[in-house]
Amino acid sequence: MGTIYLFRKTQRSLLGKLAQEFRLVTADRRSWKILLFGAINVVCTAFLLTWCSSTNSMALTAYTYLTIFDLFSLITSLISYWVTMKKPSPTYSFGFERFEVLAVFASTVLAQLGALFILKESAERFIEQPEIHTGRLLVGTFVALFFNLFTMLSIRNKPFAYVSDAASTSWLQEHVADLSRSLCGIIPGLSSIFLPRMNPFVLIDIAGALALCITYMLIEINNYFAVDTASAVAIAVMTFGTMYPMSVYSGKVLLQTTPPHVIGQLDKLLREVSTLDGVLEVRNEHFWTLGFGTMAGSVHVRIRRDANEQMVLAHVTNRLSTLVSTLTVQIFKDDWARPVLASGTMPPNMLNIPEHHVIQMPSLKSTIDELNPLTSTPSKPSSPPPEFAFNTPGKNMNPVILSNNQMRPFGVGYNYGTTPYTTTFNQGLGVPGVGNTQGLRTGLTNVANRYGTYTPGQFTQFRQ
């Protein structure tokens, strides 16, 4: 039998969770204005789609897609209000700011997909151009233009405002900027209006309405229906060119990349951190954009053994907090170990020294372990104590004991016979032609002491 839960917590459905979050957003009065504009947008879009069907105009359909994009921007603004109300949770420890980025990315990508659909339909119309009815073409153009401008200028959309300023300029903005400079050279008084970077959404709304007005005039004068398809292609290309830089910027934020314009500032701050008192090395640094205008990062700092961890942590956080709002700093103390040779009383099983050879093994630490890891910041070597040295056995390394069961004459001090090669490494120094020596013979017995902890002859006892 399974475990019986008397008060089991009920699982809410997805619709129930969405309804709960929607009630949380609507509790704020600032969101009522967004909801009102959203309702008007749905009604206006429905009328425009009906007029697109009655006029059979592909250009008006492409322009109506901008009204649908306005609906996505209103939803993004609503998500922005929701993010400000939510607090970080165990699942989303950095907060919910990335939902804003995801909403902007989804809105711009959907707008580009709509532009590609218009290009596909326009390519089919170039083969067989249908007749265009201009009865409601001009009315639909001005209704869409008025509503788009009114929505963009009335609702403060923080995510799209940040992306439009931070992303690279579109080709439409660059061409308009060139024309504005030429115009301001003739009329200097217009420099305050045209020279600043224009809002890309307002620019595409005006450019699309201008293309529809030209289409209306050419169809009314010459019945030139192909201009409607050409205007649809122009509006689709302008839409794609305007949305592409924003989707690229928001996509890079979702991929947790570091903005190029702050890399130099971060390198300067990391160099300042590496020169702080007690800091030996700064490594494993990683910084990324958490949301629009907020950065997060993590860094590992290696400090001296005698340094104050809290003081170093406070200084590092103070230096990096100017750019990184959410920062994780891990402090590591310098991990050097003092090597000490084995000293002390001899084990009982080593009293019969002539039956054993004690060979001190070299250090198992390789040269690769002594190298500092490559980091983007310079490391400062620590100052080891005078008795510290590399490639020496540690204090916890026991000597290796190899048994020697070869018979020897009792009571004779030295045997001057010739040692065969088969017994070279059983007794003595292992040099051919040298007699068998009794007792302990290693390469270190007659060497002067370097470390002060090993005394010659400590283990060299003889049994007479």
Curated annotation (Swiss-Prot):
<dbReference type="Pfam" id="PF01545">
    <property type="entry name" value="Cation_efflux"/>
</dbReference>
<feature type="topological domain" description="Cytoplasmic">
    <location>
        <begin position="156"/>
        <end position="200"/>
    </location>
</feature>
<keyword id="KW-0862">Zinc</keyword>
<comment type="similarity">
    <text>Belongs to the cation diffusion facilitator (CDF) transporter (TC 2.A.4) family. SLC30A subfamily.</text>
</comment>
<feature type="transmembrane region" description="Helical">
    <location>
        <begin position="65"/>
        <end position="85"/>
    </location>
</feature>
<dbReference type="GO" id="GO:0005794">
    <property type="term" value="C:Golgi apparatus"/>
</dbReference>
<comment type="function">
    <text>Has probably no intrinsic transporter activity but together with SLC30A5 forms a functional zinc ion:proton antiporter heterodimer, mediating zinc entry into the lumen of organelles along the secretory pathway. As part of that zinc ion:proton antiporter, contributes to zinc ion homeostasis within the early secretory pathway and regulates the activation and folding of enzymes like alkaline phosphatases and enzymes involved in phosphatidylinositol glycan anchor biosynthesis.</text>
</comment>
<protein>
    <recommendedName>
        <fullName>Zinc transporter 6-A</fullName>
    </recommendedName>
</protein>
<feature type="topological domain" description="Extracellular">
    <location>
        <begin position="222"/>
        <end position="223"/>
    </location>
</feature>
<feature type="transmembrane region" description="Helical">
    <location>
        <begin position="34"/>
        <end position="54"/>
    </location>
</feature>
<dbReference type="InterPro" id="IPR027469">
    <property type="entry name" value="Cation_efflux_TMD_sf"/>
</dbReference>
<keyword id="KW-0472">Membrane</keyword>
<dbReference type="GO" id="GO:0032588">
    <property type="term" value="C:trans-Golgi network membrane"/>
</dbReference>
<feature type="topological domain" description="Cytoplasmic">
    <location>
        <begin position="86"/>
        <end position="98"/>
    </location>
</feature>
<feature type="transmembrane region" description="Helical">
    <location>
        <begin position="99"/>
        <end position="119"/>
    </location>
</feature>
<dbReference type="InterPro" id="IPR002524">
    <property type="entry name" value="Cation_efflux"/>
</dbReference>
<dbReference type="GO" id="GO:0006829">
    <property type="term" value="P:zinc ion transport"/>
</dbReference>
<feature type="transmembrane region" description="Helical">
    <location>
        <begin position="135"/>
        <end position="155"/>
    </location>
</feature>
<comment type="subunit">
    <text>Heterodimer with SLC30A5; form a functional zinc ion transmembrane transporter.</text>
</comment>
<keyword id="KW-0333">Golgi apparatus</keyword>
<dbReference type="GO" id="GO:0008324">
    <property type="term" value="F:monoatomic cation transmembrane transporter activity"/>
</dbReference>
<keyword id="KW-0864">Zinc transport</keyword>
<feature type="topological domain" description="Cytoplasmic">
    <location>
        <begin position="1"/>
        <end position="33"/>
    </location>
</feature>
<feature type="topological domain" description="Extracellular">
    <location>
        <begin position="120"/>
        <end position="134"/>
    </location>
</feature>
<keyword id="KW-0813">Transport</keyword>
<feature type="transmembrane region" description="Helical">
    <location>
        <begin position="224"/>
        <end position="244"/>
    </location>
</feature>
<feature type="topological domain" description="Extracellular">
    <location>
        <begin position="55"/>
        <end position="64"/>
    </location>
</feature>
<keyword id="KW-0812">Transmembrane</keyword>
<feature type="topological domain" description="Cytoplasmic">
    <location>
        <begin position="245"/>
        <end position="464"/>
    </location>
</feature>
<keyword id="KW-1133">Transmembrane helix</keyword>
<keyword id="KW-0406">Ion transport</keyword>
<dbReference type="InterPro" id="IPR052005">
    <property type="entry name" value="CDF_SLC30A"/>
</dbReference>
<feature type="transmembrane region" description="Helical">
    <location>
        <begin position="201"/>
        <end position="221"/>
    </location>
</feature>
<dbReference type="GO" id="GO:1904257">
    <property type="term" value="P:zinc ion import into Golgi lumen"/>
</dbReference>
